[in-house]
Each structure stands twice: as C-alpha cells, then as structure tokens.
Amino acid sequence: METVKVGITETIRVLLEEKKFNTLRDILVTLKPYDIATIFEELQDEKTPLLFRILPKELAAETFVEMDDETQKLLIHGFSDTELKEVVDELFIDDVVDLVEEMPANVVKRILKQADKDTRKTVNELLKYPEDSAGSIMTTEYIVLRPEMTAEQSIKRIRRTGVDKETIYICYVTDDNSKLIGITSVKDLLLSDDDVIVSEIMEENVICVNTLDDQEKVAQMFSNYNFLALPVVDTENRLVGIVTIDDAIDVLQEEATEDIEKMAAVMPSDKPYMKTSVFGIYKKRIPWLLVLMLSATFTSAIISHFESALASVIVLSSFIPMITGTGGNAGSQASVSVIRALSLGEIKFCNAVKVLWKEFRVSILCGVTLAAANFIKLMIFDLNGKENALFIGLVVSLTLIGTIIMAKLIGSFLPMVAHKIGVDPCLLYTSPSPRDLST
C-alpha cells in the first residue's frame, strides 16, 4: 500500500509539472481525503495551493481537515480571501476551532475575518473552555428535537437541517430551557408510525458529560459504551454540544502517544517525528535524561557505602548489575500493568491494598522461580569450585527475591499515589525508575 501511495505521489508531481490539471482531478477524486492529505504533505512546495484548487469544494474541505498544521499553514498563505472563506464555510465548527488553536496569530486573524458572524461567535465560545476538556473538543452542530414532535415532523427537520450537521444518526431531545431530557436515533424514528411522538420513543436514561470533564475520560466512555456521539451539558444540564467518535479517536491517539513518550522519558511533542527538527528532539529529551542521570547517583552512593563489605567478598560486586537489572524489569512490569489498569478505569486508589496484595504474591512466585534458576546457574557455572560458593549463592538468590518483591510493590504503588494526587502516572515510570528504587 505504501509503495502504491509513493507511486501516486510521484505521478501527481509529474502531472503537476506538466500542468495536466484535468488528469490530476480525475486521479484525486478517486482517493480518500486522508490519502490526498498525505500526498499534499509529501509534496510540500509552492504548487500545493494550485493542486488544492483542483479539488471539488466538499472534498477539498474534508482533505484540509486531515492535513497536518504545516501543510494547512502553507495552503492558507497561498489562498486568496475568497478561497479561504470557501474552505472555512465548508468546515464543521469543531474543525474550525482546531484550526484556530494551531495557527499563529496572523493566520487566525485571516481565518476569523473570513468566517461569518455566527461562526466567529461560536468559535470564541468554544475557545473559552479549558484545553483538554470536553468543551474544547465538542461541536455545536447536531440535531435537536422536542418531545412533543411526531416522528414525521422529526424526519422532516432532519432532512431540512441535517446537511449542515456533523452527525444525524443520534438526535437529542431538549425541553424549552434547552435541558437534555432524552435521545433517539434516526432508525427509531424511521421505524415508528408517523404520528408517534418523540417522548414515546426516546431514551430518557442519557449518559452525558460536563463541559469541564477531562477529554481522556470522555474518550474512554466511547470505548466503554460504543457511542457514535456523546452529549455535552453545562452545570444546569443544558445541552451545549456533542463529542463525535472521530474526535474521541483523535484524543485516544494523542493520549496514548503522550503516555508512551512520558514512559520513555521524552517530553510530549505535537509534531510528527519526521517534521521535528534535531534541536527540537534534543529539547524534548535532555531534561529527563538529566533527571535520570542525577537519580542514578543514589545507586552509586549506596554501593560506595557498602564498599568495605564488597571488598571482603569481591565476587558479590559482579552480581549487582544482574540484581538491579532484574529488579528494574520486575518493577517495570508492575508499573505498566497498574498504569494501564488506571488508564482504563479498572482500578482506583481505593483498590491499593488488593493491588499490593496481588503484586506481593506475584513477586513471591517470580522471585522464588528466578532465585532458584539463578542459584542453579551460580552453582554450575559461576561459583563452581570457589570458596564459600554455597553461602554466596544463597546471599545472591535471597537478595534477588527481596529486590523483586520491593520493586514490584513500589512499581505498583507509586502510579496509584500519583493518580490520586493528580500527577500523570507515566511520569513515574522513568523518574526514578524501579531499578533505582530496588537498589
């Protein structure tokens, strides 16, 4: 698939040079918006705006949304005011908000200047919500019904207004004060008799979120309940917007990427790897590397403290890397398992005792198994024929058991503490590592 995509990109590049615009249009309209956006991102030259003008209006808007920030910025700089207005008018309101949030001030002014009055007002209202909240990712383009409307009236409203809505599969029922009282689907409306009123077929037990709820919690609800859209209400239960499945998927991807970067001791980045400069990557990585280097000094201090003991049985020092490494791996296993469970809502801080008890039993089993394997290895290969071999083998193996127990308990407990006090548990995965703590 990637080879085919590269071939298409090169074909388009050649056709663009030869100014065969009709052929270009015929090729582009057969592609999906995401694939077209990928081609635009690979081209990245002054002719990109010219290629964009070839696209039909609706396809152009769908493609524009899929592009990265740099490509969008390049296109906007090449647009006339009229062209910019046409693109903005075709975008859903949440996509306009995303665009405004990512662009520099001079570009934002152009975008808002070309937007109509209602769009500007809505964008400004959505921008007031905190970053990473449900309000910041919701859209205000949805179908609203009244409980006294009939199925026939509802379907007529959907036909009349649905073309400008982001989704029409789920309709939201509100009272005269805009309070959310129920939901119904287009399927239910179509399968009902024309004279049946909405209040008879709507579902009243509505799952919704508040505008200030964290976006990660919102995205997780999509996973738990298989929603296509989720209503967003204010503190008085008034419907103010909805979050759609495409935005929830974006949030899950962003959060997963951020967690992976934090667990690898890298500060999160908004740009794709290939579009991030060397200095940009350096700035993201060096702070945590400095922290981890300093935390490693604790290990050195402990070893120095027991230098005299190690000098008397010098062979013990050769097993330190194995013990600390195994302890670090054991702690990492526990940390990852607990962090994942916390992220999925499977455990909370109130489950700490149960989690610690489970990890303690796991650590005993793992510790005894590894210690037994290690003892056999020491007796056969490492200490065979040496003085005090049995004593050294027992000391190393028992130390290994204790290290694994301590590492797993600390590795499972720290993420829960961090989650309780509002700190991202992923930060503790590397600062300091369970390996350092187990030492």
Where are these regions (language model features)?
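Alpha-helical structural signal
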Residues: 36, 48, 60, 108, ...
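Alpha-helical transmembrane segments and their membrane-interface boundaries
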Residues: 148, 258-406, 413-427
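Conserved small/polar residues in nucleotide/adenosyl-binding loops
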Residues: 429-436
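Hydrophobic packing positions in regular secondary-structure scaffolds
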Residues: 1-267
